[in-house]
């Protein structure tokens, strides 16, 4: 088999493939044998009918279509392997189905051409000798109290209230129904026994303020306006009227902050021990976040002089991954089940789903540009991961997951760990080439933090020690009420921390070994769909739909 490559516009690589006559004949015979085994002809046992009867039963056109389909798919698979291309899209044929069938001869060479989209190569400008400004993150004394208060709030006891109206901080149970400006009910914005904590940020602007002051069993109309950037475009900026019935009022009784409480939420024995541990953790997080600020500053500077043509296929794939990740985050943080997510998505109008995708598109493009820029620098500077350090890290990851009772595919772990290590190496190299001006959260010059080279293993060990100590690491998220009518959390959680302050969100205890690339795409395998039908031909179906001679299909007109 002969394969010729050519560069095409964008990120496309053209392939011209010539299959020799002997291989064509073998493929044709293989197709016929498969048909003979599977076709039942009256008067013959399956697999025993003469070939000419099988061809007559199936139809010569469909036999030829099946043979061409098998031949092309096999040839594409071999061509991709020989050329070591890693496509991000299926193989697209240059010729129409009719043209392929017209020139197919089981006794002669067979040629065809097409293209695949591959990862584009970024054209990186300046990345050595950069000067950047990065924000140093510091720990504020009140952050420890905020963390502890959050855990106390999470374990609060809800006590019924009957002698006063609802006030901020209460948890209420309500029924509500929304109506548009014309008074028409909005069926999708309604709920029964909806539990809501009265915080302004917990619902659309104006709603919580309207509930505050209501008495038990009172029904009230509340006017509220959806934000202009609300993910459902048909509601964005719209003012609606809610008919609200207040059914229950509950107040929170927080547990006392004492040694008993500390022992309940952690393996520490005293409040002092917990505070000491949290101080250390926050300082570690401050260093880590300072380093992330530096990395972001470097990457932003590099992207200013980076050019890359992103194929739409790649952007769509990354956007879909980001949406999936935000839904997974919703599942993990608020206890929403995969079934509930699927139900929610199935009920979304197509235009709403498209709007969600559009919200993630800018981030997807930015992530791809960063990834491809780093990949180009890795190639240019010949940065690599040593086999020994890779295996050591793989063993640590496998052991860490094994302790949690999880068994992972070693090759997937190796790929994920390799990507992490390579990303760490290229960032470490870039930092060594960069001059940094450190500032505080107010933008004033400050002393640089003490950033020491750290391995993923060291970070993971620290976080595992915290996990073993039983210290809660997640922000308190209000439990999602059953029957939530407006699932705003479909969007990824917004990082509300101001730059220069330590976030109190958790750091993942273990690296992800999902299929997503963590930084540098060295080898993207074809999708399972591409593996089984790389060209997406479905020639047999196409032949069945091919118009007879002398007629044109609507597609051809």
Curated annotation (Swiss-Prot):
Superkingdom of this protein's organism: Bacteria
Biological process, per Gene Ontology: 'de novo' cotranslational protein folding; cell division; chaperone-mediated protein folding; protein transport; protein unfolding
GO cellular component: cytoplasm
Region of interest: Disordered: 438-557
Subcellular location field: Cytoplasm
Biased composition (Basic and acidic residues): 455-466
EC numbers, comma separated: 5.2.1.8
Keywords: Cell cycle, Cell division, Chaperone, Cytoplasm, Isomerase, Rotamase
HAMAP family: Trigger_factor_Tig (MF_00303)
Annotated family: Belongs to the FKBP-type PPIase family. Tig subfamily.
Protein known as: Trigger factor
Originating organism: Synechococcus sp. (strain JA-3-3Ab)
Recorded name of the encoding gene: tig
